[in-house]
Amino acid sequence: YLYVTFVKPDEKMGTYVMIADRPDGPFRFAEGNGLFAPGVEGVDSPFIVNDIDGEPFIDDDGNGYLFWRRRLAARLSADRLHIEGEPLTMQTARQGYSEGPLMFKRKGIYYYVYTLSGNQNYVNAYMMSRESPLSGFVKPEGNDIFLFSAPENQVWGPGHGNIFYDEKTDEYIFLYLEYGDGGTTRQVYANRMEFNEDGTIKT
């Protein structure tokens, strides 16, 4: 399953579900025939949410969830193609525009990662829960912003990212885009994510 944001020629956008038999593809739309420009014959594939940055999370019990821009979230259907019920808003310690969400789980703790601000002012913050992917989140002890600009390393505006977990080494790698100084270059950076004894993320 691949959850992809597409912006059509008429500037309408959404997150779509694509599927493949192999992780390296080829991927096809899970439903419908594709996306078509206005005036072009064809029936559009339906979006799973009418917004960007759809990010799936599958819990240990097999239940799936989708998180997307503006802190919205919902449970996924069993076939992973639709959301169930009305979306809810994730509760976070910091307010303001947010996109690029991420959910992951480590040692029984759920981590909800979200961006704040934008452009060269992007930062990444997080919340923690021991309850469920959709509830019980609290601000971590210490600094809840774990990634921010580092001009000394020429890193400006670390934004939307994701986790790569290496089972062999038990390492968590956070990969993210870097906006750039003054104009976007969308470079990709990677940082090792380390944790304190209480599960909080080291900054």
Show the residue positions of the predicted features.
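Carbohydrate-active catalytic/glycan-binding domains of CAZyme proteins
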Residues: 1-203
